Amino acid sequence: PPTQNSSPPQTTGAAVPFPAGISAQATGMPGLVALNRVRVTGFTQSDREVVARAENLDTGEHLEIACAYLVGCDGARSGIRRQIGARLHGDPIVQRVQSTVIRAPGLLPLIPGEPAWANFSLNPRRTGNMYAIDGRETWLIHNYLTPTETDFDDVDRDTCIRLILGVGPAFEYETIGTEDWIGRRLVADRFRDRRVFLCGDAAHIWVPMAGYGMNAGIADATNLSWQLAGVLEGWASPSILDAYEAERQPITDQVSRFAMDHAIALAAQRGAVPDSIEAPGPAGDAVRAQVGHAAYELNVNQYCCGGLNFGPFYDTSPIITHDGQTAPGYTMSDFTPSTVPGCRVPHLWLRDGRSLYDALGPGFTLLRRDRSVEVDGLVTAAAHRGVPLAVLDLDADDAETLYPHNLLLARPDQHVAWRGDQVPADPLALIDLIRGAASPFDALQPGFTE
């Protein structure tokens, strides 16, 4: 269904050149050095730093890179994960897939209906998906192996591609790249070892579904980055970093189960395609309509997945003020906006046309629904601890509907840290909790002042 009216707006699909764009953006950022063709071979860490050992793959030069913290974003085969002793747990085999990128200028005119980013091919002999890479001639073909096909070498790639595309031996295409892979549901039992952290596929692996893995990796990085920034800038206690694993590990386990359950449902549908789907005439038309409708109903939730993107909440976090109210549940496609601490800050459009998310500050933001509520005590407490805090008055039509309390404290990652109708009696205690220094010992650590 259309998602342009959702709040916040959602998009589907990510192009193959996406990583190149990210790389170009990163190389232009001040203070960031990108080392391409450099492989990290190991690291050592002490109480004060991490020293990564690396090798330039072109020159053979060996490098040592000293840093305060190291974040392993090195993918499913993560060497960082192995070195910190983290183990993957879950389901090692969910689906075997034979993937091929092809160039086929003659394919698009053969596809009925309006051009689509994704086409699902279901027939009794072979099922698979076709994804448009450039919208013209480059395609990604997924061939889903049957449960009895356990050896990729025994599956003829060309024959399967032609069965999925519905073309004969005369149809011409060029193979650009191939990859045989196994969809899994695995989550690391730890995301951290002292100064070393795991993010993205290094921490969790599941069947690729509508970018869930990419979104989860971005959420990992967003969560960890603001906490690291607080420590490095001096306003957060190092104890705040304990929140990363406490918050992200349960969420990635939940999302991994959504992805696996959906993959199992898709496999069941692929294994039950009736022979009559290719029958001519009204009888065949009826079967095709029925199978097509079932495929739509199953997959629309996969691609219109607002629930997985905006529904997860942190209910076991040590740096959130839980007030006893339970966060609403979510499904793959649906969620209920909520200000329960730990939830994503409910989105709304401000009267000046801005998205609320664009108006939030780079640090914490105190959202005030009622301008008459005094907030100086909390602002002063934040300044006393050096915590970056901005105040934003909610000038929006639906603020009272979405925000039942006068005040809400939004974290840098857009999750609710606290809510109330007035500033708490001890605002300094609240500030210490959200910066990971709730205990007196943490509050008096070097770099923090009373």
Label each region the model flagged.
Residues 1-286, 444-450:
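Core Rossmann-like FAD-binding/catalytic domain of the broad FAD-dependent monooxygenase superfamily
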